[in-house]
Amino acid sequence: MAHHDLIQAEEALAESKYSDVVMYAQQSSEKIAKALLEMERHFENIHDVSDIFYVVIMKDKKYSAYENDFQMVRKYLRWLAFHWGKSRYPVLEGGVVVSPLDRYDKNFAADVLEKAKFVYDVLLKVLGEVHDISS
């Protein structure tokens, strides 16, 4: 499912649907992180999993070989979660309602997609190496 969301994000980028890129990229990262959390029998129905990721995954010694990558993964998870609502719903900012359609541009969307791909690649590798899950 996380991979499907990455594909959707890539297609949205090609179609200049930048808020959709952000939405699908965030969703992909959340899903792959929750897959790893599920392997530890820990699941919470929230969108910002960065703190849970830290407590459950990063503090577990069996994942110590991934510490450097996990620092970036956690940073990206938090950053992507910040955009969860903003990529989906209008938000009042400075007395003005800002639509997701007006919030993001091509460069921002491409950067978001790269961050989501990093999260996906790292966590898929961990799922494969630690838990013998390949997709």
Which ranges hold each PLM region?
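Terminal alpha-helical segments
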Residues: 1-135
